Amino acid sequence: MVRIKLYVLVLSSLICTFAGSLSAAKPRVKTGLDNLLQNADEHLKGKRIGLIVNHSAIDARGRHIIDLLHPKYKITKIFAPEHGVRGKVDEHVSDGKDTKTRLPIVSLYQRKKKAPDADDLKNVDILIFDIQEIGVRYYTYATTMVLAMKAAKANGKKMLILDRPNMAAALGVYGPLLESKFHGGFSSYYPIPIAHAMTIGELASYYNSHFQIGADIEVIKLTGYKHGMYFDETGQPWRNPSPSITDMNSVIGYHLAGSLESLNISVGRGTAKPFQLFGAPFFDGRKLAAALNAAKLPGLKFVAATFKPVRSAYSKKNCHGFKLIVTNRKAIDPMRTLITIAREIHKHLPEKGREKNWSSIAHAVGDTAFVDSIAKGEQSETLVQKIAADVKAFADVRQKYLLYP
């Protein structure tokens, strides 16, 4: 009798544990690629296909779009964005052939070439864009998409946008709008805030209509996605969207302080914690971390750190600074965080050449007056209100292009 009761208790415990694990399971989001594959013939049969993709163009099982479509469907050209088709290039991307299929590759990350031209598109009936974006204006993949949309319009080609989650849409819309003198730059193209909190498909629809590109585009939607999700809540397999975005904390760090990268500092590239380690040989890490912690930024803490990058800024030199640690990502105030980190870094930059160095971040941040006010330690209420009004105006327009709750 005792043994039977023990079995019942153990069985009950196992059932409760299993039920709990089911209730705690991550939601399963299906990407545009996953959904395209269910009905690919309708879109692709008998057509010559040009792919604009990188290594992130994978299905729920981690299989790459090139390997999924070739040779059943006729891929005539592959267009490579920054970092290349297989995502192993950190700087210059060249024309060539795909290492696996030997299909021709045209680089869209060259000094004089950022979009397909008429000759590239002669043997293409339909373009497919499938690249994982992270949701900040100064990430170049969205510009590659815009320029491809313009090329598609100019050459009478249809373009499919295979939607993917915004990796950090949960941080919301924030940051200054890109001022007019920076419009059309490759790292920041259109006047939107630093973070748009849209999927790449939503952004494509917004750009196409609001900026009157007028391309023939179709978004293959996600299913199961909500804007409040971080990427690691979608159930989709992880692929570094670029070589130095290696986990969710680096995505968040890039959102919060990636715009400061052009300063004379290391942002952790060439370390195991890119966009989580920030420093330079001339910083006092303890003072910098203490000042940031004193600001009591919600959802974050800062620890003094010394690190030696193996590449990029200050390669093989000891850098002193701080490690950004996320303690509660739901509590983060991105705009306040950017202002505080920028202000404290400015205080610690060497006086010689500081202002010239400081002005270099204006393009990424998007607003020269805002950058200047941080340097002066000002808390200009007028400027803050203007940015808030601009963000609200963008958010109001953005609303009609959202495809998901």
Residue ranges and their predicted role:
Residues 94-124, 136:
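Glycine-rich oxoanion-binding loops at beta->alpha junctions
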Residues 87-92, 160-183:
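Glycine-rich, charge-decorated loop segments at or immediately adjacent to ligand/cofactor-binding or catalytic sites
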Residues 133-145:
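Glycine/threonine-rich flexible loop motifs
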Residues 183-254:
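Conserved anion/nucleotide-ligand pocket segment
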Residues 225-305:
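Glycine-rich, aromatic-lined ligand/substrate-binding cores of catalytic
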Residues 8-17:
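Bacterial N-terminal signal peptides
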Residues 76-83, 162:
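Short internal beta-strands
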Residues 279-386:
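Conserved functional hotspot residues or short segments at active or partner-binding sites
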